[in-house]
């Protein structure tokens, strides 16, 4: 978020195009830079087309209702993000929920949904509370077996997971097997705001015609577009930032485990330090803040009872001195 190239990209685009668009996309809110960013996202995810939203909450809220009817089925992971849950609620499709990353339970749901016209499996790429990665390759195997579409929310995985940070499809080798991706420009891709849906062209075309958050929300501001374009240029030029992130995550996790802490297994930048006691998680977070370390204590109802933890979000911007201060 503080990288000088992003800040300069935002400034240049605002100087060139102004502060805001004052319109939705289909009236007079589309500039060539919006199309350029959509093309950059498609290139990054190896997809055919992309549609931009004001936030990923809007992307997830606007993806199901245009595509599915009461004759169809949505099969959703139990730990999917709230935006997916709300998007499913806006749709008349029959709903199934399977236990987190449980392929046997997913198969049970798919078998039950065989009478529906279309089926879509929906999962986070990385689950935001635990930091675990969805087994997207196995999900795709079941989707092919039971003739279902696959949708992955890459908000917590894109830019982080995979050999070069291209997300779960790079990690699981599932390019061309995932039909729809959603994601955010508010985490690894700049940290401000903005969301997107990317995938097969016919799906994106339908969303452009019928997705209400896209049709009735103002376009992303030029400064967001300018910074986001710079993000994808940087990621294409070098893997340095991703490599630094992976180094930081591995160092922090290994040192914390050596110190006796219980850390949820993860390949992501989310490190859940398990404390299991709600009050203790609040006290720990408050004491760390007094030391200049900003972390968040999570407890019921955000996480299940008895699963209280501190969630540490690492970035490529952290240096070794900062990590050691937190660990010690």
What are these regions (language model features)?
Residues 96, 100-152:
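Active-site phosphate-binding strand-loop segment of PLP-dependent enzymes
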Residues 1, 243-252, 257-292, 302, ...:
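Conserved PLP-binding catalytic core of the aspartate aminotransferase-like
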Residues 63-82:
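Conserved PLP-anchoring active-site segment centered on the Schiff-base-forming lysine
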Residues 146-149, 156, 161-267, 280:
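Active-site C-terminal subdomain of aminotransferase-like
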Residues 70, 90-92, 146, 177:
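Short, structured coil segments at secondary-structure junctions
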């Amino acid at each position: 978020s503080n990288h000088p190239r992003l800040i300069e990209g935002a400034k240049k685009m605002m100087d060139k195009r102004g502060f805001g668009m004052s319109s939705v996309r289909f009236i007079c809110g589309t500039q060539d830079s919006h199309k350029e960013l959509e093309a950059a996202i498609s290139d990054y995810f190896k997809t055919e087309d992309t549609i931009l939203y004001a936030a990923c909450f809007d992307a997830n809220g606007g993806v199901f209702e245009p595509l599915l009817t009461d004759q169809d089925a949505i099969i959703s992971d139990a730990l999917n993000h709230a935006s997916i849950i709300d998007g499913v609620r806006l749709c008349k499709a029959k709903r199934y929920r399977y236990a987190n990353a449980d392929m046997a339970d997913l198969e049970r749901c798919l078998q039950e949904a065989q009478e529906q016209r279309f089926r879509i499996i929906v999962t986070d790429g990385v689950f935001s509370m635990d930091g675990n990665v969805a087994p997207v390759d196995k999900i795709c195997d079941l989707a092919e077996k039971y003739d279902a579409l696959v949708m992955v929310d890459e908000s917590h995985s894109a830019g982080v997971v995979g050999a070069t940070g291209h997300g779960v499809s790079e990690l699981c080798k599932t390019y061309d097997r995932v039909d729809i991706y959603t994601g955010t420009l508010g985490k690894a891709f700049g940290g401000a705001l903005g969301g997107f849906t990317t995938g097969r062209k016919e799906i994106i075309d339908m969303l452009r015609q019928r997705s209400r958050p896209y049709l009735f929300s103002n376009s992303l501001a030029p400064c967001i577009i300018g910074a986001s374009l710079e993000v994808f240029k940087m990621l294409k030029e070098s893997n340095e930032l991703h490599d630094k992130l992976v180094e930081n995550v591995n160092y922090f996790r290994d040192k914390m485990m050596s110190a006796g802490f219980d850390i949820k297994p993860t390949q992501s930048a989310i490190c859940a330090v398990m404390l299991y006691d709600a009050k203790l998680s609040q006290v720990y977070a408050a004491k760390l803040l007094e030391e200049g370390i900003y972390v968040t204590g999570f407890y019921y109802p955000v996480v299940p009872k008895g699963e209280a933890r501190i969630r540490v979000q690492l970035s490529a911007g952290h240096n070794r001195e900062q990590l050691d201060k937190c660990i010690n």
